């Protein structure tokens, strides 16, 4: 059975993936998705994640860019880019989620919608980001 938190992460990744193609309709897509969510806890978490990623997007993108080896941010697939964005947000800003959980979940989402290679790529990048940017308290969760 898939956890509610996995569903939440997938929804946020999908929303930012859609943003790549429908940039001008982001608020509309966000509102439509939010209105479809029945569980109030998931709804609140979804809103917090989306707003957190969106408001910290340039910082998150810079962090990701700085951890790409022999690769540029623009070369990332839309899927990998947005999985990394959500994963980076969660590593840095969601205090009570263990690093290993975040990385594992993002690997699984990357593999589900991409490929085995996407999962390996996401693992390497998020691991480097966690070591340098995750709050020190998260290493003890």
UniProtKB/Swiss-Prot annotation:
One of its GO terms (molecular function) is RNA binding. GO terms for biological process: DNA-templated transcription termination; transcription antitermination. Belongs to the NusB family. It comes from Fervidobacterium nodosum (strain ATCC 35602 / DSM 5306 / Rt17-B1). Keywords: RNA-binding, Transcription, Transcription antitermination, Transcription regulation. The keyword Transcription regulation applies. This is Transcription antitermination protein NusB. It holds the Pfam family NusB.
């Amino acid at each position: 059975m898939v956890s509610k938190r996995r569903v939440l992460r997938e929804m946020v990744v999908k929303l930012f993936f859609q943003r790549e193609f429908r940039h001008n309709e982001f608020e509309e897509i966000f509102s439509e998705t939010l209105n479809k969510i029945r569980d109030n806890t998931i709804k609140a978490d979804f809103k917090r994640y989306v707003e957190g990623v969106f408001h910290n997007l340039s910082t998150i993108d810079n962090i990701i860019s700085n951890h790409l080896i022999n690769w540029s941010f623009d070369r990332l697939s839309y899927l990998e880019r947005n999985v990394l964005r959500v994963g980076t947000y969660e590593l840095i800003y969601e205090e009570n989620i263990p690093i290993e959980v975040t990385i594992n979940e993002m690997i699984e989402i990357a593999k589900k919608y991409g490929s085995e290679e996407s999962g390996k790529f996401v693992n390497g990048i998020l691991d480097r980001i966690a070591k340098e940017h995750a709050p020190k308290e998260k290493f003890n969760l």
